[in-house]
Structures are given as structure tokens and as C-alpha cells.
Amino acid sequence: KIAENMHYNQFVPYTDRLDYLAPLANNVAYACAVEKLMGWELPPRGQALRVLCCELARISAHMLGVGVCAMDVGAMTVFLYTFTEREKVYNLCEQLTGARFTTSYTRVGGQLRDMPPGFAAAVRTFLVECEVAIGEIAKLLDNNKIFRDRMVDIGVISRESAISYGMTGPNLRASGVDRDLRKCSPYLGYEKYDFDVPIADEGDCYARYQIRMEEMRQSIKICRQVLDTMPDGVIVLDHSGKV
């Protein structure tokens, strides 16, 4: 209702608040919807920047999920690992956008600004460090008897229940539903990147943990491909119309 009295880009900051703990990706769905209605196609570099932002946000969100889950079942050390990596994502957010949480970086028709000098190198450094951290987390949790006792066969959600509840994302895929919009209905050029969509059939807490761990690995893989193939050119459409 608020958006009805705004210019389309004035509404972007409101979408930040949908999940301010995983910034960068929050504006994308709204911007993509407006662009689709207008029949606009983003410049290749603008699309690649959005993919990079979305995958960094995915890593940040999953680090929160894994860390808090581990702490809730008694694995405090893992929480320290995950929040260290999330802090690095926030540092990247600040370097790219000037803000750590409510970034308002996406614009209808492109992005607010291009990558600053040194940003790509900083992302590559983070990806290496994050990959190491994921390995350490896996060592601490994957075969930990106490962790498994508190996660395996707990909170089981069947495939049918997951669908009927309208579940999405990693929780849906942990219940055996092979659905990821990046694969089944690609946007922003996701079809150009090589990555897997992890699926589990158990539908329990441990499966949901495993899905998030593997999705972070796949996000790292995507981010590297984005940086390796980043096209030149503009990051925003040259348009003067109003929606």
C-alpha cells in the first residue's frame, strides 16, 4: 500500500527490511518483478553483480542458520565460526554499498554502483576463508554423536507435508522436493553457471543442516564463476520512463 504513492525506486529501502540480517539480495525479487512488467533486460554486468550479491547473502543466511542451530543443541564453538564468516560478508557489504545491513543496493534497471577497486580480490579472499571454515564446521558436527542424536529423525517433515505447508528453499529440498528457481526457472543468467542443487529425502533437522552446508559450498562455486566471467559494460539500463 505504501508503494502506491512512491516512485518505483523509492520503495527499494522497504524491501531491505524483509530480512535485514542477510542483506544484498532483499531488493532483487522486487526489482526483477518491476523489470519483468516493463519488459526490461538488465545489462550482463548488472545481472552478474546481482548473482554475486544473492549468493553472498545466501552464505550469510545459512551461516546464521547453522550457527544458531548448533548453539541450540549445545555446540557453542560452531556459532563462533559461523558468525566470524557472517561478519566478513557484512564487511564486503559495506565495501560495496556503504552499509552493512540495509544496503538498498539494487535499483530497478540495475545496481546503484559498480564494484569498487579491490572488491573482487576481497571476495576471492573471503571465499577461500569461508571454504576452510565450512570444512572445520563439518568436522565438528557431521559425525558428532551428540549433535546427530539431537538432529537425526527429529522434526521430520515429509515431502507431502512440505508441499502442503508451502515450504520453500532448503527446508523444502531437505524433504526430497527437487525445486530451485535458479535451475527450474532461471533468472539473472543463472543458467550460465555450473552448480548443483543439493537434495535430501530424510526431511529431518540433520538433513536441513546438511542442505545448508552444501548450498554454501555451491554458492562459493557460483561466486567464483561470476568473478571469473564478469563481463564489462554498464550496470544499469539507460531508461527515463516511469512505472
Describe the residue ranges of each PLM region.
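Metal/cofactor-centered catalytic core regions of large enzymes
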Residues: 1-243
